């Protein structure tokens, strides 16, 4: 019997290429989360989706604005996430706002259950994306903001916008001044050179006449 050598087997395994990681593809984000809540800890959760849901999600047809998360019987659920029906789904199409189960480790669910017992703490969906071809949802423990806090956020945004405008205005002024200087100074130098040249020529002519 012919036996395979260990060298040939190892050389074959070394030639097998590693799987290239697919870059993350962000599908939707909850823009109002940072405005309405103070965000604390974040968790990455998987989702149980149907085939028609995955097709419509890959076309970036999804809305997180009205979605919310709650805990029930040691399980985390995502409610009111809007995923529209797919065109080619037919009778197998899904309900656009059905309940969807979030996939988390047991120790993560235990931590979330303890934190949710604190008054004023809730779970908020932040971002929906694909990682290595799998649907993921970034969720966060959050505390609701008051009207005073929201006004402070608006003031900070306005202050940053004004500062950026002032910086742009300062950066634009020197360029305009440089352009005006460049356009004016060469003409003056040329005129001075022409005047000097004409004076020198007239002086030479006078010297020749005297001689």
From Swiss-Prot:
Highest taxon listed in the record's lineage: Bacteria
InterPro entries: SmpB (IPR023620), SsrA-bd_prot (IPR000037), SsrA-bd_prot_CS (IPR020081)
N-terminal signal peptide: none
Physiological role: Required for rescue of stalled ribosomes mediated by trans-translation. Binds to transfer-messenger RNA (tmRNA), required for stable association of tmRNA with ribosomes. tmRNA and SmpB together mimic tRNA shape, replacing the anticodon stem-loop with SmpB. tmRNA is encoded by the ssrA gene; the 2 termini fold to resemble tRNA(Ala) and it encodes a 'tag peptide', a short internal open reading frame. During trans-translation Ala-aminoacylated tmRNA acts like a tRNA, entering the A-site of stalled ribosomes, displacing the stalled mRNA.
Main location: cytoplasm
Positions of region (Disordered): 168-211
Amino acid composition bias (Polar residues), ranges on this chain: 177-186
Keywords: Cytoplasm, RNA-binding
Pfam families: SmpB
Family statement: Belongs to the SmpB family.
PANTHER family reported for this sequence: SSRA-BINDING PROTEIN, TMRNA-BINDING COMPONENT OF TRANS-TRANSLATION TAGGING COMPLEX
Protein name, UniProt field: SsrA-binding protein
Basic residues bias (residue ranges): 196-211
Keyword Transcription regulation belongs to the record: no
Keyword Manganese attached: no
GO CC terms: cytosol
Family annotation (NCBIfam families): PRK05422.1, smpB
Compartments, as annotated in UniProt: Cytoplasm
Protein's GO biological process: trans-translation
Molecular function as annotated in GO: RNA binding
The species this protein was found in: Tropheryma whipplei (strain Twist) (Whipple's bacillus)
């Amino acid at each position: 019997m012919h036996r395979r050598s260990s060298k040939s087997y190892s050389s074959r395994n070394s030639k097998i290429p590693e799987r290239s990681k697919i870059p993350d593809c962000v599908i939707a984000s909850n823009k109002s989360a940072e405005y309405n809540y103070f965000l604390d800890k974040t968790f990455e959760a998987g989702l149980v989706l149907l085939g028609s849901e995955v097709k419509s999600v890959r076309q970036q047809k999804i809305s997180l604005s009205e979605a919310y998360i709650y805990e029930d019987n040691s399980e985390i659920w995502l409610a009111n996430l809007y995923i529209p029906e797919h065109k080619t789904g037919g009778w197998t199409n899904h309900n656009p706002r059905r309940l969807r189960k979030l996939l988390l480790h047991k120790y993560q669910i235990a931590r979330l259950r303890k934190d949710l017992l604190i008054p004023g703490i809730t779970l908020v969906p932040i971002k929906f994306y694909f990682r290595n071809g799998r649907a993921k949802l970034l969720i966060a423990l959050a505390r609701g903001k008051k009207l005073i806090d929201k006004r402070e956020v608006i003031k900070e945004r306005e202050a940053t916008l004004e500062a950026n405008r002032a910086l742009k205005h300062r950066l634009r002024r020197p360029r305009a001044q440089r352009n005006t200087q460049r356009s004016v100074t060469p003409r003056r130098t040329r005129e001075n050179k022409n005047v000097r040249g004409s004076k020198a020529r007239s002086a030479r002519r006078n010297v020749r006449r005297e001689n």
